[in-house]
Amino acid sequence: MPKVALYNTEGAQVGEIELNDAIFGIEPNEAVMHQAVVTQLAAWRRGTHKVKSRGEVSGGGKKPWRQKGTGRARAGTSRSPLWRGGAIIFGPQPRSYKIAMPKKVRRLALKSALSDKVRSGNLIVVDALEMDAPKTKVIAGILNKLKVERKALLVTADIDETVFKSARNIPGVSPVEAVGINVYDILNHDKLVITKNAVAKVEEVFA
C-alpha cells in the first residue's frame, strides 16, 4: 500500500497514512482519464443552440416578383436560405451532447487520476480542517504552510460550510466533498489537498 505524509494545519508532518492500493496505487490509464474528461465536458454543454429552418422562419409568404418577364432570377419567397434574413439550411438544433460511459470505466478513470496525484507527489493529506467561522485568511494561511502555491482541489469528507465559504474566495482553490470528486477537477488542479476523513470516505465509496 502506498504511504504518504500526514500534515497538520501548521504544515508540520505528524505521521504517515496508508492509502488503499486499489484506489491510490494503480497504474494510471491516460486513455481512460481522457475519455472521462471528454465525457464530463460534453455533459456540461447545454445544447440549447437553435436556428430557424424554412418551416420556422416568419414571413416570406408572398412571392417577391412575378415568375417571368423581370430579367431577374426566379424567387418564390424572401425567406429563402439564399437571401439575407432568410432561413438557415442544416443549422444547429437543440441536442444533448452526453456521452455514455460505463460505471466501471468511470471508476477506473477516477482511480487513475488519484493514483497519478500520489505518484507525482501532488497529494497532500491533512489530519483535519476545523474552523469556528468562515475565514479566508485562515485557509490561505494553511495552504501557504503546506506550500500550496498553485491551483488546488480541497477535499473534505462532507460539505463543511465554514471551510467551503473560506476557500471559495481564494483564486485557483476549489473546495469539494469527497463523494463529489471527479476526474476533470483532479487533473485541472496542480495539488490535491485532502483531509484524513475524506481519504477514508473516498476509500469507502469507491473501493
Swiss-Prot record:
GO terms for biological process: translation. Gene3D superfamilies: 3.40.1370.10. GO terms for cellular component: ribonucleoprotein complex; ribosome. One of its GO terms (molecular function) is rRNA binding. InterPro entries: Ribosomal_uL4, Ribosomal_uL4-like, Ribosomal_uL4_dom_sf. Signal peptide: none annotated. Residues 49-79 are annotated as: Disordered. Keywords: Ribonucleoprotein, Ribosomal protein, RNA-binding, rRNA-binding. Belongs to the universal ribosomal protein uL4 family. One of the primary rRNA binding proteins, this protein initially binds near the 5'-end of the 23S rRNA. It is important during the early stages of 50S assembly. It makes multiple contacts with different domains of the 23S rRNA in the assembled 50S subunit and ribosome. Forms part of the polypeptide exit tunnel. Part of the 50S ribosomal subunit. This is Large ribosomal subunit protein uL4.
